[in-house]
Amino acid sequence: MERLCWGWWWHLGILCLMHWAAGDTGSKTKSCSEVKQVYLAKGFSLNGAPQSEISGEHLRICPQGYTCCTSEMEENFANISRVEFEAKLRESSASIQRLLTTQHRNFDSYFQDLLNTSERVLQERFPSQYGDLYSQNSKIFRDLYSELRQYYRGSGINLEEALIEFWSRLLERVFKAQHTQYSFSEEYMDCLVKQYEQLKPFGDTPREVKLKAARAFIAARSFVQGLNAAADVVRKANQVPMSTECARAVMKLVYCPHCRGHSSIKLCSNYCWNVMRGCLANQADLDSEWRNLIESLLLVADKFNGASNVENIVGAIHTKISEAITHMQENKELLTNKVFKICGTPKKTNKGSKSEERRRKGKATQEDKSAVATMDNLISDVKGILSDIQDYWVSLPSLFCTEKVTAGPGNEDKCWNGITKGRYMPEPMGSGLANQINNPEVDVDITKPDMTIRQQIMQLKIMTSRLRNAYNGNDVDFQDTSDDMSGSGSGDGCNEDLCGSGRKLSRETVIIQPATHAVPRQPNPGETGKGTRLSSWDLLICLVALLVAQCTRW
């Protein structure tokens, strides 16, 4: 029996040697050449970088299995992941701002060119058409264009009152020019102006200008203000700082697979989307009011097309003024009789009348209208851009989760899921803060929305309301609603909240990910070898123990 036991021991010894040899072959550590290449490419020194995998109990963000990253490497990767994330957001934000400001500048420049051209044509033509009537009263025309510009630029001028004031002053000047043989007191002029509505000295032109030009200016002003407000919202939303929880999640998403030895595999798509939707939850809450603003801008843009477009109205203000003066000149006798009947006959002077001569000179000259499609082109461009950026806020995660970096269909089991190479089990979260309550990747406090984002949501609502009023032809008071909001920045170094041992553990590091990913248990710090090798060794020890016990009995 003793010989039999020794035989068993001999065979077990051979088995142990074979197992050790097999274990030694399987325990050969992986090379860290790939992660070192990535690390070097990011501008870091390779001093201290391991040649092969080391135990990962020092890691604070990445899974604590075997790793190619030291504490310093993990910290550097964490910092660079934050920098790259914020840089990509800034780049996207700057691109949208450029689009909006370019459209704002193009429309604003063209609209003001129309107004400037109209005034220039008036200044060139009216001296020859109306002689002293214009030269002695040119200030009222300059004042009109000045007030139109101020209104368009957002001042508190009441456009309707400005137009009424212009027509009243023009009535006084033309009536005096037509009756130079009379002397008019201030009281007489007051009587004349008070009868303006009844007399209708300029025909229907003032009413037409009030309806069409006022609507054009209201729409144009609201449109440029809306474009400016949209760009301002994008700028301020970009100032929202990256949260600590987001920074950890992005590091784990982007660089932990390198530390884990999986540099060549892609990210699990749903994993990437969950990280980004958690990080960009506050920004996604802008979506609803942003869409309302874009839709309102598109509605107002439609006002610039058709027979009553801006080119036909703003660019022809001087023509309408000329038509009004001509109408009054051609109906001089009828108007004079009505005024004298209502206000009385004024005292005569020794001056003669040149009104007939000026009336003949003052025939309205229609300006040749060139077929310019510039406004149509501008509106077509801006409508296309507005439509393209309508879903900007909810599409931000797609900046990071592109086809280039995420695994496609058929590769769901061969992607980085936050712990290892394998399938990602959790469902993708929806967009917006409220949908992040169960986000397994980013610990989001849905009860504390970002105040900068809330302020921008309110600005979007205010601007949308103004645009809707403008679309309906209602004048609105535009004040500059922009304010200098400064977002808090992030310093250098991997702070305690991000990497420190005293950090608040999120769901991703405690419960959710290991349970839902359904991956094998990772070795704890201090364990040697891999899980499968340890299990075989434990089994061998058990066999030896059983044999010893049996031999003892024998």
From Swiss-Prot:
Pfam families: Glypican
Region (Disordered): 346-369
Any single Gene Ontology cellular-component annotation: extracellular region
GO biological processes: regulation of signal transduction
Keyword Transcription: no
Segments of skewed composition (Basic and acidic residues): 353-369
Function, in words: Cell surface proteoglycan that bears heparan sulfate.
Name of the protein: Glypican-1
The organism's taxonomic lineage, starting at the top: Eukaryota, Metazoa, Chordata, Craniata, Vertebrata
Gene that specifies this protein: gpc1
